[in-house]
Amino acid sequence: MEFTHLNESGRARMVDVGGKDDTNREATARACIKMNRETISMIRDGQMKKGDVLSVAQVGGIMGAKRTSDIIPMCHNIFISGVDIEFKLHEEEIEISAVAKTRGKTGIEMEALTAVSVAALTIYDMCKAVDKGMVISDIMLIKKTGGKSGDYERESI
């Protein structure tokens, strides 16, 4: 397997995607944030002093996707045609999923992964006053379509 972000000397480089064809691309990512049951109840009931946690986390995740190339060194600045973030509240965790879409020369996996990561960090920030033991985990790519390398779907979680 070849690392495309390394040049012949083994040093980092940004891959040249100029000769690639534009294709429709989509990526789905997931993250979890574990917390106390009381914290989940406060989020569900809108009792956090900082505001509507999930609405702010949704906007934060979208903003994160848009800024991916600013924080991931070799990531291309791409046109994002859409990002959607969903939250599933469980007894002691929130499952975050993001779907990001583009039509371009390079994939959108990093934008989807950044979206769920920033959404989880936003939840942490908004809830840390009542629950310092929260754990962000299981950040992963679930599915990607489009591009030269083909489609990918995680078999199990």
Swiss-Prot record:
Spell out the Pfam families in the cross-references.
Answer: MoaC
Question: What's an example GO BP annotation here?
Answer: Mo-molybdopterin cofactor biosynthetic process
Q: Which Gene3D superfamilies match?
A: Molybdopterin cofactor biosynthesis C (MoaC) domain (3.30.70.640)
Q: Which InterPro entries match?
A: MoaC, MoaC_bact/euk, MoaC_sf, MoCo_biosynth_MoaA/MoaC, Mopterin_CF_biosynth-C_dom
Give GO terms: molecular function aspect only.
cyclic pyranopterin monophosphate synthase activity
Q: What is its EC number?
A: 4.6.1.17
Assigned keywords, A-Z = Lyase, Molybdenum cofactor biosynthesis
Annotated pathway: Cofactor biosynthesis; molybdopterin biosynthesis
User: Keyword Nucleotide-binding: yes or no?
Assistant: no
Q: Which residues bind substrate?
A: M74, C75, H76, M110, E111
According to the record's subunit comment, the protein's assembly and interactions are:
Homohexamer; trimer of dimers.
Family to which this protein belongs: Belongs to the MoaC family.
Looking up PANTHER family in the UniProt record yields: MOLYBDOPTERIN COFACTOR SYNTHESIS PROTEIN A
Its function?
Answer: Catalyzes the conversion of (8S)-3',8-cyclo-7,8-dihydroguanosine 5'-triphosphate to cyclic pyranopterin monophosphate (cPMP).
By what name is this protein known? Cyclic pyranopterin monophosphate synthase
Q: Which organism is it from?
A: Peptoclostridium acidaminophilum (Eubacterium acidaminophilum)
